Amino acid sequence: MAVLNQLPVLGMIKEFRRSWRALCSSERTTLCGPDSMLLALQLSMAENNKQHRGEFTVCLSDVLLTWKYFLHEKLNLPIENMKVVEHYEDIKKTYDDFLKNSNTLDLIDVYKKCSSLTSNYENNMISPIQLRDFLSGTEYAVSDEANPHMPESPVKCSQNDEQVRVLVKKIFFSYLSLLVNSKNDLALASILNIPDRGLGREAFTNLKHAAREKQLSMFLMATSFIRTLELGGKGYAPSPSDPLWAHVKGLSEFINFIDKLDEILGKIPNPSLAGSRILSAIKMQLIKGHSSGEPFYKAVEEVVQDLNLRIKNIINSQEGVAVSANNISPVPPKSFAINHDTAYCGRDAVKILLVLLDEDAASAPTRNKAELLYNDESTVPHSGPSVLTLFRSPTQEKNTSVKPLRERIHKSLQTEKNKMWQTLIRSQFACTYKDDCIMSKNKWHVNSSSKPLSALHLEDDVSEGAQSSVGKARIEASSENAHVGRWKGDKLPRKSTQRQISKGKQLDLDSENLHCDRGNELYQHKNIKIPKVPSGSHSKAGGKLAQGTKGNRCPARGKLIPGQTKLTQFFML
């Protein structure tokens, strides 16, 4: 639907392009239409909320309220009785910085720059109120009241087809905008993963962080990374810890495709043919993997035909203006102007694309603001996540040493779960395993019964030589047919590596004995007396202790681990 003030806006943009040298620093500066302005304001508000509240988000009501105040304040219109959100000045500064870094201007900036020109333009200038009505979309209401409502179509698929067509049109203009202005991050966000290149939200976030660190646009950062890999060699390769390594394939495909479009733009001098080739290349990239009967495929075909026709109309209108200018041939370029910034191959094609993009910037704003700002992937296929979702980092900054409470609780529960699962996996000799529940209780509830444990542990350390001899005697008693000279009186088996058990394990085994047999064995451990052995008489002490084990089995049995007697009787059968 055509808006009443669309033609004055187009006239303002044309005047800006004619005097671009005096108004901006680059010929390739692109313009933000109403929708792009609203998206940039939403991102600025979300960034401000992240700085003050810690969350990169903003509700729709706050965006619309700020949008209304923003239009009046920037156009110097009265703002009485109008609400404004907190930190508005910070939001406005973030908005201006975003446009400046993207090499873009909004329509209000264009209006202010054009108002500083000669008085010849002031006669045809659009008024601030008209520009406000155009940007806010109030002209829709006037048009709807003047015309009766059209009956809605009973076919629901027609509405979905229209949404797909609007999406495809946005994709084409984003590709063309990025081709003309490589600093436009808003355009890159719309096409980075369309078609699917495996560059989802994580890849976009990594690219955004890398671009901010080096103070580059996202497209230039991706180009620098890929060029370094292709041309730099091993000495100039990025760091192995660079997160962009995980997205090399997708970034390479994207950069190579933009290079292909740029090559078409520079090699073909005819702007009409160059524009047609560029649109055809984008079309082949989008319809890959789609059948001709799908709505997306049909929408791509329709948009390409429409854009080709518009390019031809732009060229014809420019040629007609040049011929009708009093039949005077244009002034030949001066020598100093031949190589002045914009003298490059394909400049005519770039001018045509700029006019096409300016017409899109002067198009009517989207009526459904919620769909524009918070689009749903499930309702419109191939749309991808919203711009706000893309610019929101999926992971938190790793600048804190303390992990979040939720992560710590989850890790603790996972450890307990693994511990319980390990206790279930037991062999047929389950009696030889320690009880984890008892061990955990003994670990946290230390009482007076812990004293015998330390006493036993100290006694074990003091009588290390004696215990080694006792161990040898028990090993000899466990196997009668191995060697000559073994003891035959004691048949209790014990491994030769018994003394190599760590002190921690010995403490756990003793504590378990004390826990299981509180009535009798606890006092047996207290009454165990191990004779003191001189350091130089190991053999004698060993013989005496060996005899002691033959005569009295109760103290020796008190040092066995739980279940060892059952295991010994099992092997004796």
Swiss-Prot record:
Belongs to the PARI family. One of its GO terms (cellular component) is chromatin. Keywords: Cytoplasm, DNA damage, DNA repair, DNA-binding, Nucleus. Gene3D superfamilies: PCRA, domain 4. Interacts with RAD51 and PCNA. Interacts with PARP1. Interacts with TASOR. This is PCNA-interacting partner. It is found in: Cytoplasm; Nucleus. It comes from Mus musculus. The lineage of its organism: Eukaryota, Metazoa, Chordata, Craniata, Vertebrata.
